[in-house]
Amino acid sequence: MSNGTIVQCIGAVVDIQFPRDNMPKIYEALTLVDEGSSFAEKGLTLEVQQQLGDGVVRTIALGSSDGLRRGMQVAGTGAPISVPVGHGTLGRIMDVLGRPIDEAGPIASDEKRAIHQPAPRFDELSPSVELLETGIKVIDLVCPFAKGGKVGLFGGAGVGKTVNMMELINNIAKQHSGLSVFAGVGERTREGNDFYHEMEESNVLDKVAMVFGQMNEPPGNRLRVALTGLTMAEKFRDEGRDILFFVDNIYRYTLAGTEVSALLGRMPSAVGYQPTLAEEMGVLQERITSTKTGSITSIQAVYVPADDLTDPSPATTFQHLDSTVVLSRDIAALGIYPAVDPLDSSSRQLDPQVVGEEHYQVARGVQQTLQRYKELRDIIAILGMDELSPEDKQAVARARKIQRFLSQPFHVAEVFTGSPGKYVSLAETIRGFKMIVDGECDALPEQAFYMVGTIDEAFEKAKKLQ
């Protein structure tokens, strides 16, 4: 481990000259040691990205590079970025380097782990088909989650990705006796603050480790913070536990990679993304997996730029997931929340051999009815309902009831809506939708199905409306 000298600074990219025979390795962490620098107290860390030859390495600063100048001294650590792991991280908020940012003293952990780890070998993997009940009707019905699976919440700006994720945390993490890790990647600090207080009020803070690299931080932090959170989750998994791993937002991880790639001088590819997009996504996603010792169930929010699902970033994320929950602006505009599109959302678990014949038939019946309504919408807009055949009129009436019954009051939105949140079991969800599809609710007004939990509540509401 030798010392080097800064020779160039361009934003977050810093070039450092080392002796030719003692250059640091790729991904090695370097620290600023310049005595006259205010950064020395803060301990600015840099990560080696490229070896340019002649003893010069190109690094990314994991922190603000304001005030850096040529000639400053940098020391090699001889190892990649390592973060504390284990039980000492629970109930704490950390940054990308595993340093506490909650003003609650040092992290009580004896073990540190490098954030760059190989993915588990093929023979260590353990696929699972056990269902994970979420208590959210539309998700449990049309895109059920698997324990140890990977789930993506796709949506544009302001359609409810974070609220849906918070509700899933509320319903799963609180019922689930295991541990959770939350990685806030390039999102709003306010949301991280809300999340912390929510966990504190629910008395589950001692089961959650939180890692944040928020919007205002340099791209190096946002690029590596997902790996920091994942390293903590992997430690719990390797101890034989079932872990929930929440990431908000995977798109910001890609975006940080784009910023870093441009600063490193790589030629951009489609839509200006980095040429290594698929590889960077694979490096992260291949590690989020379940092994024979324990499982990681991952729920990831994915921002969709300009509501375009064919954009390279969401498109690259799709191929790694078991369940995709697509949030639609059109459904949100109707006032139906959660704004999940039941026709666009899908899951590998929606198979009669996994969920059972009844669940499969009800889910497909719901989708067929909604698809028929979608096809008839243009005719209704031009000619009106009167021109439809009796069968089509019935399909439209049922579809509108289904659409409203897919809405549900959330626990985490109680403070905004004033309606108490509802948790609906899978059996109740299937029973309710089966009754609508089979025509047992044809006499009820469609308003009775809006923002209720079970089908029994819809019958109660219908009595009040009459």
From Swiss-Prot:
The keyword RNA-binding does not apply. CDD domains: ATP-synt_F1_beta_C, ATP-synt_F1_beta_N, F1-ATPase_beta_CD. One of its GO terms (molecular function) is ATP hydrolysis activity. ATP binds at G155, G156, A157, G158, V159, G160, K161, T162. It holds the Pfam family ATP-synt_VA_C. It comes from the Bacteria. It catalyses: ATP + H2O + 4 H(+)(in) = ADP + phosphate + 5 H(+)(out). Disulfide bonds: none annotated. Keywords: ATP synthesis, ATP-binding, Cell inner membrane, Cell membrane, CF(1), Hydrogen ion transport, Ion transport, Membrane, Nucleotide-binding, Translocase, Transport. It is an enzyme of class 7 (translocase). Its EC number is 7.1.2.2. The keyword Protease does not apply. InterPro entries: AAA+_ATPase (IPR003593), ATP-synt_VA_C (IPR055190), ATP_synth_F1_bsu (IPR005722), ATPase_a/bsu_AS (IPR020003), ATPase_alpha/beta_chains (IPR050053), ATPase_F1/V1/A1_a/bsu_N (IPR004100), ATPase_F1/V1/A1_a/bsu_N_sf (IPR036121), ATPase_F1/V1/A1_a/bsu_nucl-bd (IPR000194). Produces ATP from ADP in the presence of a proton gradient across the membrane. The catalytic sites are hosted primarily by the beta subunits. PANTHER family: ATP SYNTHASE, ATP SYNTHASE SUBUNIT BETA, MITOCHONDRIAL. Belongs to the ATPase alpha/beta chains family. This is ATP synthase subunit beta. It comes from Bordetella parapertussis (strain 12822 / ATCC BAA-587 / NCTC 13253).
